[in-house]
């Protein structure tokens, strides 16, 4: 009998009362002080964390330094900010921090045991199985597909047309993922509608107020998310069954996972494949869509930048990811006690780093709230300290789809800039939502203007060398 892939530990209860009670029990069991900070419950602080966590975290950094405690929701959380803190958590002492026990655990009921929510051998084994799909050569081969999809979508644009770039990119990114990663035909109406509708329905759970997320029962956001998950499962499992029956697994991510065997003869179960599919759809979908929207928001706020002779789109994308890193917080739980920057941190407590806050520290970045792509120019990027710039995480947990996402963002942005300028709708104000990733809360409504190509743009197909 073929042995199964290494199994993850069982997830915690999805009952919010049980989970909150367990969190409080674990906190009482710590028995030693938390780092300095604001450790008494405050509704104002909790609401501030929900509405504007960046301001809250930067203020605490000024008061307490790079390691501090904030009581948000029902428990104390240790935050560690700055380049050295990021490097410590992501690279030098990464083994002392559990992902599965951080608050990304909240995603397990939808995503399952994908790369975001697993640790140890199970994470390493799963990541190794998928790495070939994200080699540079495979991504380069996917670029023509990306270009075809983008050009077809843009052929419907015309001068003076109003477009929500965020919504437009969400549809486009889903089509690209369906074709490039999963070999599914997005023009098969049932597949496209079902996948897109159910995926958006599921993600809508995390956009609801926190109190609504805690509710259970018919008609609640939780019930709608679970129904969407079941419908998505039917789509994925049906495709896996079809491929196994035909004997043709395909040359995409699904086929790669179906064919996977490691040196010990371990294979991946359908459930494991499903969990990785959902996780990659979630991570890649929101990263691409939000970054493209924020990029064109900043270009519209800085008129003439894209027309400058020295404009470099890659630098502009890097700067966009600095200002708006999609995965803005990295939740963990410490395995054992440790000391950082002279501050003792207990074992068994929530510990989080924040790329968003670290990317806005004035002692690291000149004019941290300004859009300045030149800060990533050759010679300047190398001067950044380790851990200063971490939009895709770092170490063994660096986003596996980073190159695919960068290629996709580049193809979409180059195609737009070669044909159009996007002007913000009068009176538009950007409101950033934080959950489950950073994105424009109210989309990005623009007016499309026909334009000469922006300066310095190489063809999209030259992006991946």
Region roles according to the model:
Residues 45-65, 238, 310-343, 362:
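Conserved cytochrome P450 K-helix E-x-x-R motif and the immediately C-terminal K′/meander segment
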Residues 2-125, 144-152, 187, 228, ...:
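N-terminal membrane-proximal hinge/A-helix region immediately C-terminal to the signal-anchor transmembrane segment
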Residues 353-381:
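Conserved cytochrome P450 K-helix/beta-meander segment immediately N-terminal to the heme-binding cysteine loop
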Residues 2-12, 18, 30, 61, ...:
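Cytochrome P450 proximal C-terminal region
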Residues 287-307, 403-420:
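Cytochrome P450 catalytic-core helices
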Residues 2-12, 16-31, 99-104, 122, ...:
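Cytochrome P450 heme-thiolate monooxygenase catalytic core
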């Amino acid at each position: 009998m073929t042995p199964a892939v290494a199994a993850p530990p069982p997830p915690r209860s999805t009952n919010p009362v049980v989970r909150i009670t367990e969190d409080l029990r674990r906190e009482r069991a710590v028995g030693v002080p938390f780092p300095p900070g604001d450790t008494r419950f405050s509704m104002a602080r909790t609401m501030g964390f929900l509405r504007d966590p960046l301001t809250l975290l930067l203020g605490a950094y000024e008061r307490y330094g790079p390691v501090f405690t904030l009581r948000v929701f029902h428990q104390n959380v240790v935050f560690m900010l700055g380049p050295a803190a990021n490097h410590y958590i992501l690279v030098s002492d990464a083994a002392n921090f559990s992902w599965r026990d951080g608050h990304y655990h909240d995603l397990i009921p939808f995503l399952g045991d994908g790369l975001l929510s697993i640790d140890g051998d199970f994470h390493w084994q799963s990541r190794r199985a998928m790495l070939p799909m994200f080699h540079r050569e495979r991504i380069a081969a996917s670029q023509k597909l990306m270009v075809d999809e983008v050009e077809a979508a843009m052929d419907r644009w015309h001068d003076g047309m109003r477009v929500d770039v965020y919504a437009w990119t969400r549809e486009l990114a889903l089509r690209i993922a369906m074709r490039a990663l999963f070999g599914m035909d997005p023009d098969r109406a049932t597949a496209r509608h079902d996948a897109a509708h159910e995926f958006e329905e599921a993600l809508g759970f995390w956009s609801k107020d926190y109190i609504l997320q805690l509710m259970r029962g018919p008609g609640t956001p939780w019930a709608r998310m679970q129904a969407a998950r079941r419908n998505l499962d039917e789509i994925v499992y049906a495709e896996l069954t079809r491929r196994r029956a035909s004997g043709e697994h395909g040359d995409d991510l699904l086929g790669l996972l179906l064919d996977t065997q490691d040196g010990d003869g371990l294979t991946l179960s359908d459930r494991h494949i499903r969990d990785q599919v959902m996780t990659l759809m979630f991570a890649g979908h929101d990263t691409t869509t939000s970054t493209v929207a924020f990029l064109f928001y900043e270009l519209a706020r800085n008129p003439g930048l894209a027309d400058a002779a020295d404009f470099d789109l890659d630098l502009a994308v890097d700067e966009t990811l600095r200002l708006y890193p999609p995965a803005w917080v990295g939740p963990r739980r410490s395995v054992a006690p440790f000391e950082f920057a002279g501050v003792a941190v207990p074992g068994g407590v929530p510990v989080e780093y924040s790329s968003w806050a670290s990317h806005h520290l004035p002692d690291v970045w000149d004019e941290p709230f300004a859009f300045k792509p030149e800060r990533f120019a050759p010679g300047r990027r190398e001067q950044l300290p380790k851990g200063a710039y971490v939009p895709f995480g770092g170490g063994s947990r660096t986003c596996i789809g980073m190159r695919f996402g960068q290629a996709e963002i580049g193809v979409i942005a180059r195609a737009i800039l070669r044909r159009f300028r996007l002007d913000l709708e009068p009176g538009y104000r950007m409101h950033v939502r934080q959950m489950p990733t950073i994105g424009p809360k109210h989309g990005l409504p623009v007016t499309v203007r026909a334009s000469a190509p922006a300066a310095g743009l190489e063809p999209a197909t030259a992006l991946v060398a």
